[in-house]
Amino acid sequence: MIRCGLACERCRWILPLLLLSAIAFDIIALAGRGWLQSSDHGQTSSLWWKCSQEGGGSGSYEEGCQSLMEYAWGRAAAAMLFCGFIILVICFILSFFALCGPQMLVFLRVIGGLLALAAVFQIISLVIYPVKYTQTFTLHANPAVTYIYNWAYGFGWAATIILIGCAFFFCCLPNYEDDLLGNAKPRYFYTSA
């Protein structure tokens, strides 16, 4: 006999692991140097620095780099991404309490709402950065050089997409409270004799 069912017990471990991976992606995005890179490798930028020397730089005034924190949009982008990261860490900690005890399932929708708020903060940051960077430094002045938003910027978007998905699941999980607690009979989508 073939039985196919839905096991909600896995959600107790999968969702915190997804949040942990989003935390790792956000750390990479916050600390990574590869937010923007020119095709001739003459410029590398991170969330914090713009380095215009051959091969880029690690980010310091001694290497001829310019701090993006001198601009209001640079501070806003960094603050929004960092606020989203802090909310994500808080939600990660709360998810253990909410998914371990039967009395704490009330917090699941709160966690989902906080994750949605963190996703909004990160989306704003990830949109402000390329728009204002392009306007401030006129990247289209030299048509021979192409600018590519690179791996660290992509990790920021990956963390944001995970946040959106986890927010949806945390908001929907209280509807399946009996399944999470193991009180419901298994529902089979298909049975064959």
Curated annotation (Swiss-Prot):
Q: What are its GO cellular component terms?
A: cell-cell junction; desmosome; Golgi apparatus; mitochondrion; plasma membrane
Q: What organism is this sequence from?
A: Homo sapiens (Human)
**Any coiled-coil regions, as ranges:** none
Give a brief account of the tissues where this protein occurs: Expressed in skin, heart, placental, liver, pancreas, keratinocytes and dermal fibroblasts. May translocate to the intestinal apical epithelial cell surface via sipA and sctB1/sipC-promoted exocytic translocation following infection by S. Typhimurium.
Tell where it localizes.
Cell junction, Desmosome; Cell membrane; Cytoplasm
Give the family from UniProt. Belongs to the TMEM47 family.
Q: How does it sit in the membrane?
A: Multi-pass membrane protein
Q: Which gene encodes it?
A: PERP
Q: Its quaternary structure?
A: (Microbial infection) Interacts with S.typhimurium sipA and sctB1/sipC.
In terms of domain of life, where is this protein from? Eukaryota
Q: What is its main location?
A: other
Relate the outcome reported for changing residue 156 to R.
In EKVP7; patient cells show a change in the subcellular location pattern; does not associate with cell membrane; diffuse location into the cytoplasm
- BP-aspect Gene Ontology terms: amelogenesis; cell-cell adhesion; desmosome organization; heterotypic cell-cell adhesion; intrinsic apoptotic signaling pathway by p53 class mediator; mammary gland duct morphogenesis; Notch signaling pathway; positive regulation of neutrophil chemotaxis
What name is this protein filed under?
p53 apoptosis effector related to PMP-22
Q: Which UniProt keywords apply?
A: Apoptosis, Cell adhesion, Cell junction, Cell membrane, Cytoplasm, Disease variant, Membrane, Palmoplantar keratoderma, Transmembrane, Transmembrane helix
Tell me what disease the record lists for it: Erythrokeratodermia variabilis et progressiva 7: A form of erythrokeratodermia variabilis et progressiva, a genodermatosis characterized by the coexistence of two independent skin lesions: transient erythema and hyperkeratosis that is usually localized but occasionally occurs in its generalized form. Clinical presentation varies significantly within a family and from one family to another. Palmoplantar keratoderma is present in around 50% of cases. Olmsted syndrome 2: A form of Olmsted syndrome, a rare congenital disorder characterized by bilateral mutilating palmoplantar keratoderma and periorificial keratotic plaques with severe itching at all lesions. Diffuse alopecia, constriction of digits, and onychodystrophy have also been reported. Infections and squamous cell carcinomas can arise on the keratotic areas. The digital constriction may progress to autoamputation of fingers and toes. OLMS2 is an autosomal dominant form with onset in the first months of life or in early childhood.
Annotated membrane-spanning segments are 12-32, 79-99, 110-130, 151-171
Q: What does this protein do?
A: Component of intercellular desmosome junctions. Plays a role in stratified epithelial integrity and cell-cell adhesion by promoting desmosome assembly. Thereby plays a role in barrier function of the skin against infection. Plays a role in mammary epithelial tissue homeostasis and remodeling during and after pregnancy, potentially via its involvement in desmosome cell-cell junctions. Required for tooth enamel development via facilitating desmosome-mediated ameloblast adhesion to the stratum intermedium during the transitional stage of amelogenesis.
